Amino acid sequence: MTKIKRQINNFDFRRIKILLKKWNVVIYFVLILICFYFIIPIYFPNNDKMNLWLSSIKYYLTYPIYNESLTKTDAYIINTYYYPKSSSLGENAIGMILLMNRNTQRDMTKYRMKLIASNSSHQSVIVTPKFLEESYSSCPYINMVAMVNTLPNLNKLEIFDGERKMEIPFQMGKTTAPASVIICISPQFVAEQWQLFVAHAHVARKFGGHLHMYVTSIIDTFFDLVQEYERLGYVTIDYWMRLKLANSSVDSVEPNLHSELRNQAGAQSDCLYQYKEAAAFITFFDLDDIFIPRGYDSYFDEFSALYELHPNILTFQYTKRETMVYNKAKIEDINFEELFGHTWFVNEEDYGKVMTKPGNLNSMWIHESWNIPTNRHHVSKSNYIIHMQKPVDPDGTDPVSYRMSNFEMLESMQLNASTLIPIQDDLERVLKSSNISMTAEDLPNKTYYFPIIYRCYYEKFYKKPKKDSCPNGEGCLIPQRTGTNCIHSDADFKSGPEMWPITYHYHVNSKWSRTKGCHA
């Protein structure tokens, strides 16, 4: 015991004090990191405001170390929307949809873009938007959304890198919608399955929905049919471009080949921002995703009931159930009781799609948003999406015979005839009172491009999913066919001045282009 006391007395505590003084900054920094990264999140796991504040603190603590710009890249500004008043974004808000190169810096959500906003009162302000990322794969280009508040009566918006400026075209977000429920349809390319469109359009109309359909390329006769439905108020057709860099550099990465699934997530985010202040509810479906309310007379009623039952949920997801489908050669032969009144389904659920209030969401991926906390996202078990994935041709040919589905008779999933008869009546009314019947005479009665594209997708990534890959339909061989022509989205493509670290590209004057042959 005496020996231990002697050792303690001989120990030089002054040296420890000096060392602590020298390292006190480092020690404090480590303690702060432990506090913000580990301790506070334990006590506030579900507090969104606290989590947002913590994220901001973490960013400012680590920005000097990790977030330097790494390399010169390109970005494409798809659309920019301005909201004088927004319930979710605030006043004088900007929402910008971009395709950006993830290699610009380590965390693209922390990218420091500078925007100069000017208005009609000769006021100007420099603002830095917040970024949200929506991507899953390892593609170089990722879907990004930039949000920031600017000035009243905005009339000019520019990107500024410290030396050069580039003006950004913008448009007003919609203030009214054709229906209270908007159904965003993912971009169609080499589209020919007109039967799916007719089914979706009439189902949506019956239950209070409106289709907003993006088109990259589509069979010309199918496009004529969709335009007739647009005149009748069933659908809004929108452009979705194959992106072109007007002035690319030697190091520029081609955007179409190196973006996830043709940047479908970008279209979902774009649709969200168009209707952010106009629709009560918004969904993000493919053309072959048909949703029919169960126990309710309309989409609005079912969605409202879900939110009343789960008041803390921001987004709902409905899973998919594949159903057996036989296409008809003529539009007059389509029968909704035959389409949806049977019981043949695959007895398993596929990754679903999202429904939400537009104000609850600021960005969107393909199947869900990665920016919604898991405890604020709910997978509904009260209903499902009818997935008309692989329709059989009118002559009985199965276009996807190499990937047969295991159908079973599931009596519990049968829809009542009373639900389907009014939809059939609506189709027959339209055929009698419009130009639809005449326009439909030239529609293809058998699929040609669908099995080609499906096979390409299957061989490229569905057959053998690869980790860290970039799933994309680019490179699919699309053989041309005599007498089959397409309508393509087109525009005047522009490039801004070379900037550091990002050069920006965009398009103006969107238009439909009729061409011989079809390409994706």
From Swiss-Prot:
It is found in: Membrane. The chain crosses the membrane at residues 25-45. Its EC number is 2.4.1.-. InterPro entries: Glyco_transf_92, GTase_92. Residues 181-463 form the GT92 domain. One of its GO terms (cellular component) is membrane. It comes from the Eukaryota. One of its GO terms (molecular function) is glycosyltransferase activity. It is a single-pass membrane protein. The keyword Lipid biosynthesis does not apply. Keywords: Glycosyltransferase, Membrane, Transferase, Transmembrane, Transmembrane helix. Belongs to the glycosyltransferase 92 family. This is Glycosyltransferase family 92 protein C35A5.5.
